[in-house]
Amino acid sequence: KISKCPNAVMKVGGAQQRVGAWEPPFHNNLRQSPIGSTELCDLLYERYIYAIEAFGPDRCMFESNFPVDKECVSYRTLWNMFKLVAKRAGLSTSEKTAVFSRTAQQVYRLN
């Protein structure tokens, strides 16, 4: 319902972090080695694309919750995963610009 409101935007991120006592299966505490961006994308793609499809790329912005996310995934891995999500979704150059920068610039009035 919120996506139907034209002034609502979605910060797309956070699906990889711990929630209360629940730890995602890729949490660093549960792995022999850190997760890579491709594996993370495979696990979380459906969650992220759901938001992008509901709101549209022009009302979504990728975001991180660093330093909180650090316990689950590296900063580099997270942003590389976002690049893979955009590629897998077939986002155009303009749509990629929206989710990686333009939406945030508009929402936070950074222009």
Which residues make up each language-model segment?
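Mid-to-C-terminal alpha-helical segments outside catalytic/metal-binding sites
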Residues: 10, 46-50, 54-61, 70-111
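Catalytic pocket-lining loop regions of alpha/beta-barrel enzymes
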Residues: 1-61, 106
